[in-house]
């Protein structure tokens, strides 16, 4: 069989177009003018035919410098005739503007075509027309109509239906021997239910001159894009952590089985997306502090508490069954999660069931297939978990044995028959059940047209499987966090190590690629937590507790000479804490004398002090105050932290003699100590440094990583782009078609106090609040003056704002958000229920999930009613469904 590939691409000198995917090595095309490229290949095809997949790329001196968009690869079915010739006319594929429609969120759930048409009939002399039309749901199909009898003679009712076997690409093969040229045609949106044409495409007639085909030759015309004049697709969804779900059979915490019940409610209320928080294992000490879902010990393993024990099996011991039944009722009746009791009880169940069923399950074909596919991460995770409990610490550096990961030693421990194996294989068993359960929930959601949206944390724990097995990928001498923002005036210190991007780049970001690809098994959309981390990360020194002493990595620090070019004379004192008698009373009040006596020492007679040895870093101060949480101790501790961070510049961690202006220092005493000329000079360099200097640099950093990572799967990509946002972020997200996050009370336009919903970009996710924020009702009561301005200026109401957010007000705000321009409006469970006085939680304070400024937040929020009650809440469900329908977020085509 002969394949003739043809593509138009304007190259520069030294560049060549090549085909990849057909053979282990890419195949060069040839050109005479640097524009039109061709290649002719001979291929053996089995008699039953075969499908080939391929893509184009540009190489220079043997190096790939550009690839076309290949998330949805080119696919052609070849018949089995050895004498057949295929002439394939392609166009270069850039990332589509409507990339979201090609994501698995749409092709597998929202606009899925579960019953695909057969591969089109084949002809000796054929004309294959292929076109991309992703915005078509299962009740419609693409049809073709033209100036031929075989194409209906422009009668839309006689249009020929195309095959969706490779949806969202459509195709048809025409008998070229019966066609008259020139051929003219257009595409039609056809209603399969009503068996009639719905509308014509918006383009002019498409035209094809006589291709002069030979016998046994088929011409393939590919890469046509079809657009119809129909409304842009919009949908609504719910955001709720899995742990917060509550059914009548839950075991004190939401589980993967409960996800199916949430899907039922989403369908009942016309919602299309369920967004959850990370579900990875976070077990460090088995205490409630492990409840933080972003501090996982594995980027692959799921948290055992999410196992639905009903699906795992039934214990034969009747007494044990009775005991667990009683415990289930007790834990499930609690208004909030008792993390320790829930996990302890579930682990008792796991151990009993494993003794009863483990051997049989581990011998099953299903488990063996799962193990072979996942052993690369499953074995280290299981051993890590076993050793963590055996040595009573997740800090592997303190383990007496295996503190340094050796793959050979771990492999020996995992061999059946060893003393360690029963303890290790228990984790295999649990992870296998979790895999089956989440996969089942995912498939259930897809079947019902609902998307499960996951969450990828930006960081990993420094006491995790990955830090143990792959330490070369991380900078373990720093802490990731975030600069000061609306969430925390002192910045956030997450404690995670930062990534060694230079090492990751060398193997093509394999670590990240595997992570994304694993996630794609269970999710069709995901949120990149803190997407800014792919541009730069806020890195905090290990000696700091707060985030104020951090610096961006990578970054372009300033030299003394550059600092002084702004008019500020650089002094070494700017690197040291500025501590002066004049403001100590403001910081410490009645504790001032104690602080001066115990923690400070005088420098000279001018009133200057320095920290005493032993208290020069925030970590040293933290150590002193461990366990002292009374009001006075907290006051003194936080004041000492403030003194230590009261510096004007921070030294660069890599380059000696280079510096960073300290973030947010204008609020601190050291800045106030400058004269007006110095303040103005500092503000000029500060503005240049934080808002202009790095734009192009960080753009390039992001474009090294994000294109191949976001295109490594077909999941819909959403970025959490909140906080201190460089100007380059929106450019990158737009170039890569990543959905942004829009929150009205955190507007991206600094001129606005509240975001303008009608100005949100279409490629965005709109929400009222996130898990890191107070709910709508909670926010309404936080700052009455701000609420009043929102009530008058944004909602357009006259008079005095109510002191609480009434159901009517909440419904108005929800409706406004549903009417926004965003493709997705995903609201928290709490904000959805706020619109109904009967069903919303009477206690607003119980609805808060996380307070970012509190590093010891207990993540224990639960629904205040069960999913069964929710399904029966007809007035609420009807109201939500009607709101979604009448705001255009339940499209029928």
Predicted regions located by residue number:
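An acidic-aromatic pocket/loop used at catalytic or ligand-binding sites
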Residues: 5, 93, 99
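C2-type phospholipid-binding modules
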Residues: 79-88
């Amino acid at each position: 069989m002969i394949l003739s590939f043809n593509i138009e691409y304007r190259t520069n000198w030294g560049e060549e177009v090549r085909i990849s995917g057909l053979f282990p090595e890419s195949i060069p095309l040839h050109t005479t003018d640097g524009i039109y490229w061709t290649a002719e290949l001979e291929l053996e095809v089995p008699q039953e035919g075969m499908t080939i997949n391929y893509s184009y790329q540009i190489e220079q001196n043997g190096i790939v410098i550009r690839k076309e968009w290949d998330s949805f690869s080119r696919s052609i079915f070849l018949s089995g005739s050895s004498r057949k010739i295929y002439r394939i006319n392609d166009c270069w594929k850039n990332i589509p503007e409507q990339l979201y429609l090609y994501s698995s969120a749409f092709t597998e759930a929202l606009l899925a075509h579960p019953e695909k048409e057969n591969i089109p009939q084949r002809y000796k002399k054929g004309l294959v027309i292929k076109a991309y039309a992703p915005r078509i749901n299962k009740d419609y199909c693409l049809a073709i109509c033209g100036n031929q009898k075989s194409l209906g003679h422009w009668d839309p009712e006689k249009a020929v239906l195309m095959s969706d076997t490779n949806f969202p690409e459509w195709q048809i093969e025409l008998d070229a021997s019966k066609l008259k040229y020139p051929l003219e045609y257009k595409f039609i949106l056809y209603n399969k239910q009503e068996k009639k044409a719905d509308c014509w495409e918006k383009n002019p007639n498409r035209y094809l001159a006589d291709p002069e085909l030979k016998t046994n030759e088929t011409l393939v015309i590919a890469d046509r894009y079809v657009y119809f004049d129909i409304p842009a697709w919009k949908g609504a969804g719910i955001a709720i952590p899995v742990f917060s779900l509550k059914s009548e059979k839950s075991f004190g915490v939401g589980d993967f089985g409960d996800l199916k019940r949430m899907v039922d409610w989403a369908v009942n209320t016309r919602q299309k997306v369920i967004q959850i928080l990370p579900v990875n294992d976070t077990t460090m000490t088995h205490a409630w502090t492990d409840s933080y879902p972003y501090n996982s010990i594995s980027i692959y393993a799921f948290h055992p508490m999410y196992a639905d024990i009903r699906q795992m099996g039934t214990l034969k011991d009747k007494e044990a069954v009775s005991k667990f039944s009683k415990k289930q009722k007790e834990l499930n009746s609690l208004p909030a999660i008792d993390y320790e009791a829930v996990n302890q009880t579930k682990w008792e169940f796991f151990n009993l069931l494993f003794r009863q069923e483990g051997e049989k399950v581990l011998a099953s074909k299903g488990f063996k297939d799962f193990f072979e596919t996942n052993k690369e991460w499953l074995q280290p995770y299981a051993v890590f978990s076993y050793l963590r409990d055996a040595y009573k610490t997740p800090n592997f550096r303190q383990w007496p044995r295996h503190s340094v990961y050796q793959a050979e030693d771990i492999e020996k421990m995992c061999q059946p028959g060893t003393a360690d194996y029963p303890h290790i294989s228990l984790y295999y068993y649990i992870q296998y059940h979790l895999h089956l359960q989440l996969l089942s929930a995912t498939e259930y959601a897809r079947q019902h047209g609902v998307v499960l949206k996951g969450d990828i944390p930006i960081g990993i724990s420094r006491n995790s499987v990955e830090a143990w097995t792959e330490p070369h990928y991380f900078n373990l001498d720093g802490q990731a966090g975030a600069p000061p923002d609306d969430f925390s005036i002192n910045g956030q210190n997450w404690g995670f190590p930062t990534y060694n991007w230079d090492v990751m780049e060398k193997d093509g970001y394999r670590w990240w690629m595997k992570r994304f690809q694993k996630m794609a098994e269970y999710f069709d959309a995901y949120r990149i937590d803190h997407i800014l981390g792919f541009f730069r990360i806020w890195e905090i020194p290990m000696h700091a507790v707060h985030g104020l002493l951090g610096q961006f990595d990578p970054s372009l620090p300033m030299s003394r000479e550059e600092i002084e070019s702004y008019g500020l004379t650089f002094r070494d004192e700017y690197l040291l804490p500025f501590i002066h008698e004049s403001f100590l009373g403001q910081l410490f009040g009645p504790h001032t004398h104690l602080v001066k006596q115990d923690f400070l020492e005088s420098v000279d007679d001018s009133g200057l002090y320095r920290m005493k040895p032993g208290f020069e870093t925030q970590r040293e101060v933290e150590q002193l105050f461990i366990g002292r949480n009374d009001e006075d101790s907290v006051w003194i501790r936080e004041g000492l932290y403030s003194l230590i961070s009261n510096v004007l510049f921070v030294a660069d961690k890599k380059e000696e003699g280079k510096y960073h202006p300290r973030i947010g220092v204008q609020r601190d005493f050291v800045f106030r100590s400058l004269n007006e000329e110095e303040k103005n000079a500092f503000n000029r360099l500060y503005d240049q440094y934080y808002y202009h200097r790095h734009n192009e640099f960080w753009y390039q950093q992001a474009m090294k990583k994000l294109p191949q990572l976001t295109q490594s799967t077909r999941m819909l990509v959403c970025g959490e782009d909140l906080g201190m946002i460089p100007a380059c972020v929106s450019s990158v997200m737009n170039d890569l078609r990543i959905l942004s996050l829009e929150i009205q009370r955190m507007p991206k336009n600094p001129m606005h106090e509240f975001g303008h919903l009608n100005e949100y970009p279409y490629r965005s996710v709109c929400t009222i609040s996130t898990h890191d924020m107070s709910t709508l009702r909670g926010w309404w009561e936080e700052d009455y003056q701000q609420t009043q301005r929102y009530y008058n200026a944004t909602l357009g109401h006259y008079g005095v704002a109510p002191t609480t957010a009434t159901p009517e007000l909440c419904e108005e705000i929800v409706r406004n958000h549903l009417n926004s321009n965003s493709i997705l409006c995903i609201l928290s469970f709490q904000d959805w229920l706020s619109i109904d006085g009967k069903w919303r939680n009477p206690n607003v304070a119980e609805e808060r999930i996380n307070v970012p400024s509190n590093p010891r937040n207990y993540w224990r929020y639960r629904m205040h009613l069960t999913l069964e009650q929710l399904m029966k809440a007809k007035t609420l469900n009807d109201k939500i469904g009607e709101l979604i329908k009448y705001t255009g977020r339940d499209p029928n085509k």
